[in-house]
């Protein structure tokens, strides 16, 4: 779980010099807003919105995921999602979605004074209700950081019975891999699977004359290495030079016949990733574009 690095005051817009309005009656100073990461902005928004509610509810879904510090993939939802056990149907108001539902024993916790669904309940809600790619991004994250166990998630999902989204959630839990080191790698893995590309080995290590190097993806049958490049990975010129030497050493290995690099733009675009991977020598068995909501085995 992450917290804001420093205290950010939410006030009425008229009290601020250069306000960024969060919603009616709530704003923060622009420099403070611009200093926050996307996740910190989402957390701040949830806290401010919840503070404006007239009745106590339990923060849920993507709003709870923000409080837990979980990554996401789907377009940012700036509405506050809560469970209101008094309702018999979901109600959508100005910036707030009040869901029906019940909170079982152990499914309610308090984060920074805000009633929130437990981590397990939050992850299962995301896995059932968001896109398959979003589900895998979150599941890879919680498995990697040992926040939850696959067996526990599978058991908790089974206990829910035949609820909406249970098949997608089960497929996402089975597909998740703790070795994925970033949301970009998780998204890449899902997109590659939907293109019919064989499952890669993750974080495979190679011994080269320049030393031992670990790669993001390795397809041994095709002899192809795949690397997801984050936007900030090579800002340091020295890091860029080191990476060039690393890639040269890997390309010279006899078992390596292709090398593919891509960014988040390609990772999230089936057609673009298909072009990158096929040019490196990987067989693309399904035509792009393909819906990111399709599940493994479908």
Predicted regions and their residues:
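Short gly/ser-rich loop at a beta-strand->alpha-helix junction or flexible surface loop bordering the NTP-binding
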Residues: 1-165, 201, 281-298
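Surface segments flanking catalytic/ligand-binding clefts of nucleic-acid enzymes
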Residues: 1-9, 14, 143-298
């Amino acid at each position: 779980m992450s917290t804001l690095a420093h205290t950010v005051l939410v006030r009425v817009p008229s009290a601020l010099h250069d306000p960024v309005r969060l919603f009616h009656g709530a704003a923060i100073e622009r420099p403070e807003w611009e200093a926050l990461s996307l996740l910190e902005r989402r957390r701040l928004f949830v806290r401010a919105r919840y503070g404006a509610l007239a009745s106590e509810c339990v923060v849920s879904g993507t709003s709870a995921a923000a409080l837990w510090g979980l990554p996401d993939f789907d377009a940012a939802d700036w509405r506050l999602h809560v469970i209101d056990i008094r309702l018999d149907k979901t109600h959508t108001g100005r910036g707030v979605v009040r869901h029906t539902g019940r909170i079982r024993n152990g499914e309610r916790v308090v984060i920074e004074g805000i009633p929130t669904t437990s981590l397990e309940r939050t992850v299962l809600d995301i896995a059932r209700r968001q896109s398959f790619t979003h589900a895998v991004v979150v599941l890879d994250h919680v498995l990697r950081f040992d926040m939850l166990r696959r067996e526990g998630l599978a058991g908790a999902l089974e206990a829910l019975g035949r609820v909406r989204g249970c098949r997608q959630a089960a497929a996402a839990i089975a597909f998740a891999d703790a070795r994925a080191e970033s949301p970009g790698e998780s998204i890449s893995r899902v997109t590659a699977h939907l293109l019919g590309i064989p499952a890669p080995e993750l974080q495979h290590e190679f011994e080269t004359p320049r030393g031992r190097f670990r790669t993001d993806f390795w397809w041994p049958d095709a002899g192809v290495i795949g690397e997801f490049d984050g936007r900030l990975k090579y800002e340091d010129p020295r890091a860029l030079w080191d990476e060039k030497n690393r890639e040269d050493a890997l390309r010279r290995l006899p078992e390596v016949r292709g090398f593919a690099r891509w960014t988040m733009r390609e990772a999230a675009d089936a057609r673009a990733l298909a072009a990158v991977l096929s040019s490196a020598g990987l067989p693309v068995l399904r035509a792009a574009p393909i819906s990111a909501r399709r599940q493994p085995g479908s």
